[in-house]
């Protein structure tokens, strides 16, 4: 068995799918840890080519020998909710100003997409998490 590499950093970023480039914020975040930025950009863009237009969070593990691995996460719940509700952004005051609405079926669909990244045991618990996010954005959930 090969010896384990020592981890020197864990970097979490949210990047547009297929549009990673060395410009800020990506360049400085990776460059400060000695990672080859273009290698990461090419690998990330290749893996996210089919998800164009979405923001895909990525968790980059940088090792002491300056090599790296990365794990793609599911798109943020807020982004999925905005897309489902057809709104540009959430509200500043969710108590008084509602910006859109989604159905329970749409919430279930989003929860199924997000399930691997949520800390929920089952789909109903995942739906409650997504409904809470919708409420805080000023999006109402209808039956």
From Swiss-Prot:
User: SUPFAM superfamilies recorded for this chain?
Assistant: Ribosomal L11/L12e N-terminal domain, Ribosomal protein L11, C-terminal domain
Against CDD domains, the record matches this protein to: Ribosomal_L11
Q: Name one GO cellular component term.
A: cytosolic large ribosomal subunit
Any one Gene Ontology molecular-function term assigned to this protein's record: large ribosomal subunit rRNA binding
Mitochondrion among the record's keywords? no
Which domain of life does the UniProt lineage start with?
Answer: Bacteria
Q: Name one GO biological process term.
A: translation
Q: What does this protein do?
A: Forms part of the ribosomal stalk which helps the ribosome interact with GTP-bound translation factors.
The record describes its quaternary structure and partners as:
Part of the ribosomal stalk of the 50S ribosomal subunit. Interacts with L10 and the large rRNA to form the base of the stalk. L10 forms an elongated spine to which L12 dimers bind in a sequential fashion forming a multimeric L10(L12)X complex.
Name of protein: Large ribosomal subunit protein uL11
What organism is this sequence from? Bifidobacterium longum (strain NCC 2705)
